Amino acid sequence: IYESTVYPGATEEDCIPVIERLSGLKYNVDFFAGYSPERINPGDKEHRVTTIKKVTSGSTPEIADFVDSLYGSIITAGTYKASSIRVAEAAKVIENTQRDLNIALINELAVIFNKLGIDTEEVLLAAGTKWNFLPFRPGLVGGHCIGVDPYYLAQKAQEVGYHPEIILAGRRLNDSMGKYVATEVVKLM
């Protein structure tokens, strides 16, 4: 059972052929595969491995049931059985891509509001009074996954002939925020 965040197709297109080649075994005959992406947030005391719903999948319907049952015996929040390994891989990579893009949007708004002389936190507090406003805050993208995972999806998209403009624009903006923040801090000194 793979848990790493990868682009859709990585498990079956890249990992499985290596196992077949090195072992001499045949996929879905001699061995099977499952995929269930990790969803933990390092340092988060509330959302722990057992309290976050787990997406599961398997290389056959029977293996999908086995993987789902295995995690279901551990995860108190429950499981969601995806229809395929690729669907589970895609679900995970878009979770992180969506977070990255939401942070990029707020970062861009913070730059604009700064240039307009408007306090971004005040704007976000006011906007947050609407029930469906997503409460993101400007800042640097951290962790081992959010700043990298969108590139996995972007690479796969480009391999199939699509240029993911929004995903890459979000990455460019978030990648530039370190320099922007440093410049603003120096101005305050």
Language-model features: where?
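Structural/interface elements that position substrates and couple domains in central-metabolism enzymes
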Residues: 2-189
